[in-house]
Amino acid sequence: MKFKIGEDYDKFYSKVFNDKIKIKNSIRYGYTSFQEKNGNGHPNIMATRFDYLRIAKAIMDDYQNDTCVGKYLKEIHKRRIPKLSKEKEEPLFGRSKSYGGQFHMDFPGLKENVVFGMSGYGGNVILIDMENSRILVLNSLHYNNNKYKYNHKKLILDPFKKGK
C-alpha cells in the first residue's frame, strides 16, 4: 500500500484506524528490513483484543453496506484462490481451502457461508460471517505444543456454525 499511497502512508493509517474504526489504543504495524525505497511495509499489525474486534466489525459493516471497501471485499471473495496446503496442516482452523487478500476463506463445515478469517500468533483467530452478522474471536497465548493446543471444533467451528 505504501507504494500506492506514498508519503501519506502514516496519515492514511491514522485516518482508517482512528477516524473510521475508532480504535481506542495504539496500533503497531510491522516493518521489514527492505530498503525504504522499495517499501518496508509488512502485512501484520498488533492491536489489543478489543481493537481487533473493532476492526472485524468495521470489515463486516463495509461488506454489508456496499461501500468502496465492501465492494473490494466482495471482489476478493469472488476471486479467492485455492490453497495448496496439506490436509494435516496445523493449526486445524487454518485448514481453510482458499484465501483472498489477507483472509482465509472456505473453512471446513462453513463453506455455505461467506466467512473471512484471520489468524495470528499463538493461535489467535477471528472469523467474520459477512452475511449473517456474526464475529467469533478466540484469544490464545500459546499454540506451540500439545499442552497448549485447544479443541478447534469445540471452540471455533461448532459455535460459529451453530451460533452457540
Describe the residue ranges of each PLM region.
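C-terminal amphipathic alpha-helical segment
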Residues: 48-93
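Alpha-helix boundary/capping residues
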Residues: 16, 20, 59-62, 79-83, ...
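Alpha-helical scaffold elements that line and support the substrate/ligand-binding pocket
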Residues: 1-17, 52-59, 133-136
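Active-site helix/loop module of the DD-peptidase/beta-lactamase fold
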Residues: 3-42, 47, 64-67
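Short alpha-helical "patches" and their helix-cap loops
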Residues: 9-19, 69-74, 150-158
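Active-site Gly/Thr loop motif
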Residues: 24-30, 43, 78-136
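Active-site-proximal alpha-helical segments within enzyme catalytic domains
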Residues: 43-65, 124-140
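Structured C-terminal helix/loop/strand segments within mature extracytoplasmic catalytic/sensor domains
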Residues: 115-164
